[in-house]
Amino acid sequence: MKIQIPDYIQVLIDLLNKNGYSAYVVGGAIRNAFLELPIHDYDLTTDATPKEMLQVFSNYRVFQTGIQHGTITVLSNKQPVEITTFRSENIYEDHRHPSGVSFSKSIEEDCKRRDFTINALCYNNSEGLIDFFGGINDLQHKIIRCIGNPHERIDEDALRILRALRFAGRLSFTIEEKTATAIHKQKDLLHYISEERIHNEWVGILETNALPSILSEYSDVIQIFIPELTNSSIQYTLNAIIRSPLDANIRMAILLKDIPNGKEILERLKYSGAEQTVILSCIKHSTKSLTSKIELKQFLSKLNIPFDIYHTYRYAIDTDYPRYNMLAYYHEIQDASEPYLLKHLAIDGNTIKGIGYQGKEIANILHACLDEVIHHPENNDAKILIDMIKRTD
C-alpha cells in the first residue's frame, strides 16, 4: 500500500533519518488514508528522544508543550506537526493518565500502548505499512477492536469507552464482541473522567450517522453520565433522531425534550452558554403553534436562535409540523424584508421619546408598532407610525 505523504511531513522524516533515527506517520492519518477519508493532521513517531529531536530540529520553530511526555510540535511549512518519541507507559493510577512514561527504541512497543487496532498503523516510504495488531484487517471488516486485552485497555483509560462509540458511529463500524463486553462491564469507570472530556466525546457521538444504534445498544453506558435518559425515553426519541441532521445541539435537544431538568444536565456536562441557548430554545418552543405567515413573524420576533436550526429540530420531533409552508413563508419574509424585529422598525426609542413619552411607555409603544407592521408590513414607515402613535395618544 502506497500512501502519499505531504512534502512538509516527508521533510521532517528525512531529517530524522539523515540524523540516524527512524520515523513513521502513525495513527489517524494512516487509518483515514486507507479509508480514503480526509486527513486533517499528521502525527509522527520516532526513536529520537525529545532532547535529540530538539537538536535535529534546531533550525525549525519548535514548541515544547508536551515534552515531558515525549512530544514536541514542529512548525513545518507553517503547519504544526506533533512528533513523539517511541514510548511505553507505566501503571495508570486514575483510569485516565499513566503515572509516567518510559522512552523506547521499539516501534512495536509504542504501538502496543495505543487504544484500537485501527489507530496503531504506521507508515513511511522506505518500510511501507507496518501493522502489528491486525488493524488493516479490522478496517476491511469495519471493526473497532482494542489492542490486546480490552479490559486492560479500558481500565488504563476509561475515555476509550466513549472513543470506541465515537469511532464506531463516525465510521459506521461494529465494536468487536470482547471490546463491547468490556465497555458494558466497565462503564462505571467513566465516573473518573472529567465532564469536559465526556462532553467533547459525546458531541462527537451525537454527530454520527449511527447514533440511533449507539443509543439502543449502549444506553447503559450513556446513562452513566446522563442518568435521566431512561431506556423508554431513549426509545421514544429514536424516530426523531433518525429524521434529524448530524447536528449535536439539535440531537441533544431531541433527547432532552421531555426531561424537566435539561438545563442542569447541560451545565453538568459543561455545555457552553451558546450551546445551551440553542438546545433550550428548541425545547422551549417544541409545541409552538405555527399555521400562518403572521404567526411565523410573531414567533421570529421572540426566537433567539437561527430559524433554520429550530425549523430542522421541529420537523424531526413533529411530522405534523407544516415544514414546507413555514419554509416558504420564511423565504417570503426574508425576500421582501418584512419587519419582525424591533430593529426592523422605521422608528426607534428616540423617535418616541421626541413625541413626549418616557420609560416603559417607550417600550410598550415600540412593541405596539412592531405588532402593527407584522400584520401590515406596508405601514413600516416613520410618518405612518408617528401618526399612529399620535392618534392613540
Describe every region a protein language model picked out.
Residues 1-393:
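Catalytic cores of the polymerase beta-like nucleotidyltransferase superfamily
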